[in-house]
Amino acid sequence: MKKILMITQNFYPEIGSAANRMKNIYLELKKKGYEVTVLTSDPSYPNRNLYKDESYWCDETIEQDTVRIHPRTRKYTRNLFRRLMLYIEVVLRFILAIGKDKAKYDYVFVSTPSIFVAAAGMFAKKKMKAKLILDVRDLWPESLIGVGFFNKRWILKIAYKFEYKMYHTADQILINSRGFFSYITSKGIDPKRISFMPNSLTEEELSVIPAENTGDKLTVIYTGNIGLAQDITKLISVAEYLQDYKNITFKIIGYGYKKNIAYDMMKMKKLANIQFLKPKNREDTLAEVASADIAYVSLVEEDVFKKVLPGKVIDYMSVKKPIVADVDGYAKEVIGEAKCGFVAENRTVSELGDYIIKLASDKQLRKQLGENGYQYAFQTLRWKTNIETLVQILEEKDVTEESLHVCMESFHK
């Protein structure tokens, strides 16, 4: 069976969509009989101390195939220089580890962002004379510009040149969002080299039974990153808008650069209807979502975020929760296709709040939208079936017709 070297900065037991995607790709390939070695970093996202809790380390067998580097830079930060130092250190340590690896591989599978990690994949391709599969989970440097992370022209010039090189060096490109297709082809990439494999759900996750609320109090939940791309301060304003509705409370479970800003905003407004919880492992987070009544998702109003689908949308679908969304573009399109919630057209606080009121007052509507989302996920977002896109690439079968049909279908509706 073919041997694969997977290179990823984010991996088990880290929380977040990136690590979850890589873990499941690894597990599915192992089930198919492939020999997979994972080159990754010590878990550090969003912070290293989180993983001192043994509840995050729930599968010891994964570590048997995992080679970890140990960066000295230990903290994610908004500081541009320190963030760049972390990325550069990680890729240099990856390259050193690859240089010492005497094994033979048929494929190198590298996941971005950050695009720096792709440099390790490109090095591995050349050293090992293997084919390179590039997994694109986000568009860098576009997304960094979208959140205002940096705008230094000389850095952007280098980043765009490297991005171009990265796409053109890859033998095959996987995307987890249909919204990435036109952007990548605009860089001169043959559409036949691009395949669509969305973030998906395991059979166990699709078997979680959501709690049924028999009372009159309802919880609106948000989970995941509270960073520059999510605009969670608007959710605080929505909670303020609904503070007279004593039966509606908000629960925020997450981490990120803007968590303290959102928390301080809640305190300043003296809102008693919001509960902030520390990050939890994936299983416990899904259990929290399953026990809630309405799920919330948001992205800042920048063009680059019209191309992405937050992983939490898929998680919300898996436990049959109706969604209220402050999004546009691809995420809006998926929620519309699934008929699993409401997307605010004008993206105002009052519109979002009114959708929550509408759902809170109609139990049958909540149930129907939740069921719609679950059926959409069950039919289209299962790792068990979606991994076949990657398997066909590894077996060098023609995936173009099927994968690109899925990728492009919504653009022609």
Give the ranges of each region predicted by the language model.
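Carbohydrate-associated surface elements
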Residues: 179, 200
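Short hydrophobic beta-strand element within catalytic cores of glycosyltransferases
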Residues: 294-297, 315-326
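N-terminal subdomain of nucleotide-sugar transferases
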Residues: 1-61, 172, 242-244, 406-413
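Conserved acidic donor-binding segment of nucleotide-sugar-dependent glycosyltransferases
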Residues: 337-338, 342-349, 358-364
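Conserved donor-binding/catalytic core segment of Leloir-type glycosyltransferases
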Residues: 5, 213-230, 235-240, 251
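Nucleotide-activated donor-binding/catalytic signature segment of Leloir-type glycosyltransferases, i.e.
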Residues: 253-254, 259-287
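Membrane-proximal helix-turn-helix segments that form the acceptor-binding/catalytic region
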Residues: 92-95, 99, 116-119, 123-127, ...
